């Protein structure tokens, strides 16, 4: 989205198409392609311009981001909380880190529903390559330290999120958070993900 005029055209088109919900990711470009430096700028412009959207989602990174400090990420979430309706997290492999992050945002008054991003059924090699590319670093470091979990992940050529889901539901504090459900990253493996579901 290059500027407010472009955003106005997009809002108009969304309205014409009857689209009522959007997701605003942060983006990973080193330099902005237009007037908006980040998702917060875009969300502010959406509010200023007005729209007919019922739901606006924003991204979050429970395990951090390779180019942004955790402090800056948390500040951005706090600033965006009144401009969005739900959160979708980046893909995560560590139930404890996820639980602690969910508790932390709840304590900070960020009470939006959170859809936790999990990898779906996918070839292990493709999952690891994608994880490295998108910066799921803490999870990968976690896997290196926890040989049993890493062994479980590596024991077949296909990754399945069942054990991770079980670990998340067994976290002591998870029921005191705003966990709304799970967003499954299927990596275009729709058929295998649907069979798993």
Regions found by a protein language model. Give the residues of each.
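Conserved, mostly hydrophobic/aromatic
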Residues: 14, 80-83, 116, 168, ...
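Active-site pocket-lining/capping segments in soluble small-molecule metabolic enzymes
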Residues: 26-27, 34-64, 108-173, 187-188
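Active-site-adjacent beta->alpha loops and helix N-cap segments on the catalytic face
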Residues: 2-10, 28-49, 67-71, 91-109, ...
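Short, acidic/polar
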Residues: 4-12, 68-79, 161-171
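Short, well-ordered coil/turn segments that N-cap beta-strands
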Residues: 18-20, 51-56, 84-85, 110-114, ...
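Ligand/cofactor pocket segment of small-molecule handling proteins
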Residues: 52-85, 92-94
């Amino acid at each position: 989205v290059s500027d407010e005029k472009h955003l106005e055209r997009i809002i108009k088109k969304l309205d014409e198409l009857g689209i009522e919900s959007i997701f605003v990711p942060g983006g990973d470009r080193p330099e902005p392609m237009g007037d908006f430096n980040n998702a917060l700028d875009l969300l502010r412009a959406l509010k200023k311009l007005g729209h007919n959207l019922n739901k606006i989602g924003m991204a979050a990174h429970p395990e951090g981001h390779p180019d942004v400090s955790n402090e800056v990420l948390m500040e951005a979430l706090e600033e965006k909380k009144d401009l969005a309706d739900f959160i979708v997290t980046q893909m995560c492999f560590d139930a404890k880190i996820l639980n602690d992050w969910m508790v932390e945002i709840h304590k900070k008054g960020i009470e939006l529903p959170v859809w936790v991003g999990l990898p779906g059924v996918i070839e292990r090699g493709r999952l690891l390559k994608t994880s490295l590319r998108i910066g799921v670093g803490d999870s990968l470091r976690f896997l290196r330290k926890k040989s049993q979990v890493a062994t479980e992940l590596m024991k077949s050529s296909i990754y399945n999120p069942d054990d991770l889901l079980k670990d998340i539901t067994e976290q002591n504090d998870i029921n005191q958070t705003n966990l709304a459900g799970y967003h499954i990253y299927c990596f275009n493996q729709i058929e295998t993900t649907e069979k798993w579901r």
